[in-house]
Amino acid sequence: MHASGYFDVTLAPQAADNPQVRTAQIDRLSIDKKYHGDVQGTSTGQMQAIKDDRNTGAYVALEKVVGSLQGRSGTFMLMHYGYMSEDVVGRWLVEIVPESGTGELTGLSGTMKIIPKDGKHYYEIEYALSER
């Protein structure tokens, strides 16, 4: 199945909590999102990112979505992984953590594509709901 829409996101820097992270210059940010479209709801999470002065770097993130997907209510988790080289995206993968769905989203699996355009973040989700 296919779902699409956009989200508003706020990223807030968090304090580095150990010397190794400060030495490596790994940024830690909180994530707060509001989803519009086929996903209606909010999410919270955390991102870790690293980059150099050429804008080459990578990020990982985890978030929990609370709301509905095409009218089905529940929660699910997302796992992000991405990297870029000198501002060119090399890979950007967002997966629904399999079996993380609750409520009417139990059995949810799939992937999300994020498309930044004109100052907004659009999403496209390809997903399946297994019958349990």
What are these regions (language model features)?
Residues 1-132:
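Targeting-peptide/extracellular-domain and disordered-appendage signature
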